[in-house]
């Protein structure tokens, strides 16, 4: 212990190689560094895993639709361009070609952005739902404990009342009837 205190941050001349390895850095043993969060000792939470499992297929589907729209617009342009150039004047097919290309790229981008924004929205909703759940569970647990305590208190009061009546009936009831009966007869 004294050697470790004298060794300081860098291990010092008195510290052995093993002591330097245990200290790791900052003069703290490695176990404390792990506890402080320098190394992650647990994986993703259940809510994170559920969020990923739910949102990946949806986002993937929307991104696939985005890719299909892009592919369809490129193939459509490749097929329609020669037909427009052969059977129409030059300006009309050029305008249609540019319009189709712009619409295809805009559709592709819109579907991609829609997929990403829906993933973000669902992820935020899922996180908020899972963060609220423990509060509701804790509130229900507290109410159940209060109800159980109140029921126990009422049961104890009822038991004491019954016990008190039984004692009165056993001891005070016989003496009270004889004394009360004699008082009424003399009046």
Swiss-Prot record:
Query: Region annotation Hydrophobic: residue ranges?
Result: 52-123
> Bias regions of kind Basic and acidic residues — which residues?
33-42
Pfam families per the record? Oleosin (PF01277)
Expression across tissues = Found in embryonic axis, scutellum, and aleurone layer.
Regions of biased composition (Gly residues) lie at: 170-187
Q: Where is the composition biased (Low complexity)?
A: 155-169
Post-translational modification as stated in the protein's UniProt record: The N-terminus is blocked.
Keyword annotations: Acetylation, Lipid droplet, Membrane, Transmembrane, Transmembrane helix
Tell me the GO BP annotations in alphabetical order: lipid storage; response to freezing; seed oilbody biogenesis
GO CC annotation, single:
monolayer-surrounded lipid storage body
Q: According to its UniProt record, where is this protein mainly located?
A: other
Q: Which PROSITE patterns match?
A: OLEOSINS (PS00811)
Q: Where is this region: Polar?
A: 2-51
Q: Output the InterPro entries linked to this UniProt entry.
A: Oleosin
- Give the signal peptide, or none: none
Where do the record's region annotations for Disordered lie?
17-42, 155-187
Family as reported in the entry's similarity comment:
Belongs to the oleosin family.
Summarize the protein's role. Answer: May have a structural role to stabilize the lipid body during desiccation of the seed by preventing coalescence of the oil. Probably interacts with both lipid and phospholipid moieties of lipid bodies. May also provide recognition signals for specific lipase anchorage in lipolysis during seedling growth.
- Give the PANTHER family listed for this entry: OLEOSIN, OLEOSIN 20.3 KDA
Q: What is the official name of this protein in its record? A: Oleosin Zm-II
């Amino acid at each position: 212990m004294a050697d470790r205190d004298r060794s300081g941050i860098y291990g010092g001349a008195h510290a052995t190689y093993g002591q330097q390895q245990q200290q790791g850095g900052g003069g703290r043993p490695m176990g404390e560094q792990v506890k402080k969060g320098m190394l992650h000792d647990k994986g993703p939470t259940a809510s994170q895993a559920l969020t990923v499992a739910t949102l990946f297929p949806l986002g993937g589907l929307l991104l696939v639709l985005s890719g299909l729209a892009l592919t369809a617009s490129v193939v459509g342009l490749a097929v329609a361009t020669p037909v427009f150039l052969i059977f129409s004047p030059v300006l009309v097919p050029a305008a249609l070609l540019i319009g189709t290309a712009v619409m295809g790229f805009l559709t592709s981008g819109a579907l991609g952005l829609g997929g990403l924004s829906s993933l973000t929205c669902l992820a935020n909703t899922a996180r908020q739902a899972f963060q609220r759940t423990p509060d509701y569970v804790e509130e229900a647990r507290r109410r159940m404990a209060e109800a159980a305590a109140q029921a126990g208190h009422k049961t104890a009061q009822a038991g004491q009342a019954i016990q008190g009546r039984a004692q009165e009936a056993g001891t005070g009831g016989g003496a009270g009837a004889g004394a009360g009966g004699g008082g009424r007869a003399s009046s």
